[in-house]
Amino acid sequence: MNNQGGAVAANGQRPQAQQQQQQGGIMGIISTLIRFMAIYYIASFAFSKFLGTGNNNNNGGVVLNNNNGTTNTSIPSNSVRLANSWPEGIEFNMKVYLSTSNETVGDWLVWEQDKLSYDWKDSNTIPTKNITFDTTPYLQNNGSLFAHIITSRRAYLNQPKSQLHKVHPLIVYLPKPKPKGKNLLEEKSKDEPEVEYDPTELISYWKPTLSLHLIVDHTIYPPDSIPKEIVSYFNITNGFYSPIIYCNEFWLYREHLKPVNETVKQLSIEINYSSMGLFKWQLQIQMQKSLDMQESFGGGGNSAMGGASVGDEFKRMLTDNDPWILGLTLIVSVLHTIFEFLAFKNDIQFWKNNKSMEGLSVKTITLNCVCMGIIFLYLLDNETSYMILASSGFGFLVEFWKLGKAMTIKITWMTSLPLPKRIEFINKDEYMSKTKQYDDMAMKYLSWLLFPLVIGTSIYSLYYHEHKSWYSWVVSSLVRTVYTFEFIMMTPQLFINYKLKSVSHLPWRVFMYRALNTFIDDLFAFIIKMPLLHRLSCLRDDIIFIVYLYQRWIYPVDKKRSHYGSEEAEEVQQQDKKEIKEKVEEREEEKQEEEEEEKEKEEESTSSSKVTKRKTKKV
């Protein structure tokens, strides 16, 4: 969005989908997560402030769930302090059973570990054990499988032997992946069946890892002081809470899941155990809640359809980058979002107050509006998340509004139906001058380059890529051209600046904000690991930015005047008109005085000539 720098300044914001593609995803991911985490914490604060929390005092007490979520424990609101029922360092054992029922444990023991201690000793980190077993017809036909984790400790002082039970599903049901496209030029065989896609059809996926943790926490909680975010995980009995068994799926990505069908003959699972602290556990579950909320709002990508979610990309970024890069990325992403907002705000302000199209390229604005429409259709055809789709649709409406400010739109309505019969786009009077002449000239030269590129990329895509339909081919070919060559569509504005020898008509405040974001994008293009060609694609739009800077240098703007389209600019314009009017009146007065003087001289010369003639006659 920002790589075009000042070029985009006069013509609106670049689509968000293109921003995510050009930045390799990292800037878009972090910016998106920052917004959603802010929304999440604001909403949490509002609910806790005005609606109360789940652990407020009430006459009926607080209901807490235990680890397996099957029973509840009611704790009176005036209960004593809650302490851990397991002392530090006590030995325990852990067993994992597999069962097709979430209620019956059965006798299928697959993992067992003795003499574990409830503390931070290194001996509590158990190496991964791989278990492989044959699949059954039940599992191959969307059957379920559960892991029953049973943790037991010996009797301690006056406390009896304790046993914890956690049930964890190993099968998850997700929508069936969408079928891939086809080569539209290949002839379809008559014997080949027609594949129909049902978005409501679910298939089973196998979780190949089971990471077990026992949360080490010896905090003594005063009454009603357990954080509401974790209160549902506690199992409390007689003023004591039991340790929490945590099945960690935070690092389980969508791509790790294995589909289970008739062709799968064996399944394997890796089981490991280690201790985990309360802070780390809370951090993981809070972050996972934020990511889940983002996906529920439609901002998680197409993970259910087979693609990687934004949450998975964010987690992968945490593991693949150094901490200092993550910290720098977070700070710069916040600045990036602020500059983006300021650029958008000032861009809207400029076009709202702009009264003249002199020096501005209407063709470039029209092209940008068409590009935004193409990208919106492409995102709609690919069933992109609602968040990205709404952002792109809003951007298209903004560009159409700017087109309405640049031109006069005349709508003729039908007499029988409330539908438009004809829509006319009429250029404004200020534009019908040298600006339009230069704009048409630049568009003619640009079309010589643009049309062959569109045709060439479309033919290449038709031969070598797969598409769902002919409509998808047309839209994807157009959007590929937009993503690849959109930067050259700003050349008409450069051409107009060159011909008019002026850049004062451009919104330079918007230009500066987007220029800062351009530097940020270029910085991350070299910090973040990505292919060389992708880095060059991030730098190519800087050509337009550099040309704009050069034009700004050779065509300086009077700093005492505002050319931003604001109220100050209108006052300056009115003052200029007043000064010009006064100068014109002065010149007219001077002309009148000169004419009167000439008339007087003519009259004097005429009278003197008459006197001379009279004297001559007398002589």
UniProtKB/Swiss-Prot annotation:
Concerning InterPro entries, the annotation shows: CLPTM1
Biased region (Basic and acidic residues) positions are: 574-590
Q: For bias kind Acidic residues, which ranges apply?
A: 591-605
Extract the ranges annotated as region (Disordered).
1-21, 566-619
Main location (coarse class): membrane
A Pfam family the protein falls into: CLPTM1
Chain segments annotated as transmembrane: 26-46, 324-344, 360-380, 384-404, 445-465, 474-496
Subcellular localization, per the record?
Membrane
GO CC field: endomembrane system; membrane
Following inactivation of the gene, the phenotype reported is: No visible phenotype.
Q: How does it sit in the membrane?
A: Multi-pass membrane protein
Q: Does the keyword Transmembrane apply?
A: yes
Per the UniProt entry, the disulfide pairs are none
Keywords, A to Z, come to: Membrane, Transmembrane, Transmembrane helix
Locate the compositionally biased regions of type Low complexity.
9-21
Family label: Belongs to the CLPTM1 family.
Give the protein name, as stated in the record. Answer: CLPTM1-like membrane protein cnrB
Q: Which organism is it from?
A: Dictyostelium discoideum (Social amoeba)
